[in-house]
Amino acid sequence: MTIRTLLIAAGLTLLALPAAAQTAGCKPAVADSELVKPGTLVMSTNPTLPPMQFVDSNGQLKGMRITLGNEIAKRLCLTPEYVRIEFSAMIPGLQAGRWDLINTGIFWTEERAKMMPMINYESQAISVSVSKGNPLKITKPEDLSGRPVGVELGGFEERKLRELDKTIVAKGLKPIEIKTFDNFATAYQALRAGQTEASVAIDPTAAEYSKRGDFDRALHGLFPTPVALAMKSKPLSEAVVAVLNDMQKDGSYKALMEEYGLLPNEGAFKVNGPGM
């Protein structure tokens, strides 16, 4: 039996999902005053990163992060609700109070931790996908010199690609022709259409596309960095970190990470944020 059968099934955007939060005797662990919507945990996600978060053929949200978000909501006695939105709008939307939690695999940075409470729960690195057969023989980052490379706008991946570009230029090579897209799905569509010669995404997504036979993964394991959940409310972040530590103790967190081939966090979870 997989962890998916043990935890809540994924749901639809802007649709509250039936959950144990509605059962008698389940008292919400977070006050309504700390939430965008009473009794509800509203989460933003960009479901263009299979198998971590994606939309299946029935239009339903699926993936590791959706399963995790649903389980967190369940243990908080709240109803999970998702807002599908591009990553570039997520931090401004959180600060504006449009959702309670960013659940899209946001990379932790010191700059972001100064803006909002964050809980590191996963480690991720970056891959470079290319056309089948790797016709350009890309085997090292310098091979991207002078080539059009697609990436999602506004994320950690774009930042690291631009840092890589500076490193390449400093070596006297031609700059990478960086092309930004609203999300990873459109970036991969551009690679498929020949508009770019490579696409940058997190390791599991590039591996999934390779497994499907769509693209090859030329490079992987670049810039390993913690991935986090991000919240606006300090009380909510404290409640969420308590849930994650409970999941650590009962083994459900480790089971979920291992199901997706991810390395689980071995230590206790903690909140990193302004004044924390």
Describe the function of each predicted region.
Residues 88-92, 105-114, 160-167, 190-223:
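A ligand-binding cleft/hinge motif common to bilobed small-molecule-binding domains
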Residues 47, 123-130, 204-245, 262-276:
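Periplasmic-binding protein-like
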Residues 66-75, 134-135, 142-143, 147-155, ...:
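Extended ligand-binding regions for polar small-molecule ligands
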Residues 42, 78-79, 96-104, 147-148, ...:
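Alpha-to-beta junction loops
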Residues 3, 9-11, 21-70, 74-79, ...:
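N-terminal hydrophobic or amphipathic helices and topogenic motifs
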Residues 70, 74, 79-143:
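Acidic, polar ligand-binding/catalytic clefts
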Residues 22-26, 30-31, 156-176, 218, ...:
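Ligand-binding clefts/hinges and TM-proximal coupling segments of bilobed small-molecule sensing domains
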